[in-house]
Swiss-Prot record:
EC number(s) on file: 7.1.1.9
Record GO cellular component, one term: mitochondrial inner membrane
GO MF annotation list: copper ion binding; cytochrome-c oxidase activity
Cofactor(s), names only, from the UniProt record: Cu cation
Protein name per Swiss-Prot or TrEMBL: Cytochrome c oxidase subunit 2
Regions that span the bilayer: 27-48, 63-82
Gene: COII
Topological region Mitochondrial intermembrane: 1-26, 83-228
Catalytic activity, reaction form: 4 Fe(II)-[cytochrome c] + O2 + 8 H(+)(in) = 4 Fe(III)-[cytochrome c] + 2 H2O + 4 H(+)(out)
GO biological process, one term: ATP synthesis coupled electron transport
Self-association state and partner proteins as the record states: Component of the cytochrome c oxidase (complex IV, CIV), a multisubunit enzyme composed of a catalytic core of 3 subunits and several supernumerary subunits. The complex exists as a monomer or a dimer and forms supercomplexes (SCs) in the inner mitochondrial membrane with ubiquinol-cytochrome c oxidoreductase (cytochrome b-c1 complex, complex III, CIII).
Source species of the chain: Zootermopsis angusticollis
């Protein structure tokens, strides 16, 4: 999760987020190279001897500054389109969960199991409890097995919401009367935090999301206890 003075993206917990971080670094490198080039040309223009100040046209330079941006865009759009289509693919999910946004809490249904559903509300912050994160704790965590492809179906019961887990690279809009889906695979255990990312009313900032990633064995035990 994000901490104070963190200038980087969150540590990835899924292959998709890892690829998004690589793409971010790739694009940032290209932008840095462009910035350095522009600064170099601006500096050289200010300290030159104005030998070409009466030049009206230059076919070579015009060809270069037309082709160069096109080549740069190819280097940016190619990995971008690859990631875009990769994020839309559903890889034979191991299980499906459904999340419903309400004002101002989340409901979860495990579609592959019988009577496994619950609501998730924000836990009030306690000043004395140093282990709590402000506005990020919930009374019920979404427990999921790691190293398994999960499909999530997102909708809303009242107004627009957005189910977002930054460390998974997931941001799915919750729209009333519409089902949106996405998929992810968690590759490490732990707690993953997120929040509603669509302004949905007075208590919009009080809709945290907590995913608890566990082993398959512990997940089965959790399902059995919840079904009883």
């Amino acid at each position: 999760m994000t901490t104070w003075s963190c200038m980087n993206l969150q540590d990835s917990a899924s292959p998709i987020m890892e690829q998004l971080i690589f793409f971010h670094d790739h694009t940032l490198m290209i932008v840095t190279m462009i910035l350095v080039s522009v600064l170099y040309f601006m500096t050289s223009m200010t300290i030159n001897k104005n030998e070409n100040r009466y030049m009206l046209e230059g076919q070579t330079i015009e060809l270069i500054w037309t082709i160069a941006p096109a080549v740069i865009l190819v280097f940016i759009t190619t990995p971008s389109l690859r990631l875009l289509y990769l994020m839309d693919e559903i890889h034979n999910p191991t299980m499906t969960i459904k999340t419903i946004g309400h004002q101002w809490y989340w409901s979860y249904e495990y579609s592959d199991f019988i009577k496994v559903e619950f609501d998730s509300y924000m836990t009030p912050y306690e000043e004395d409890n140093k282990k709590m994160f402000r506005l990020l704790e919930t009374d019920n965590h979404v427990t999921l097995p790691m190293n398994s492809f999960i499909r999530i179906i997102v909708t809303a019961a009242d107004v627009l919401h957005s189910w977002t887990i930054p460390s998974l690279g997931i941001k799915a809009d919750a729209t009333p009367g519409r089902l949106n889906q996405s998929s992810f695979m968690i590759n490490r255990p732990g707690l993953l935090y997120g929040q509603c990312s669509e302004i949905c009313g007075a208590n919009h900032s009080f809709m945290p999301i907590v995913i608890e990633s566990v082993s398959t064995k512990k997940f089965i035990e959790w399902i059995k206890n919840l079904s009883e």
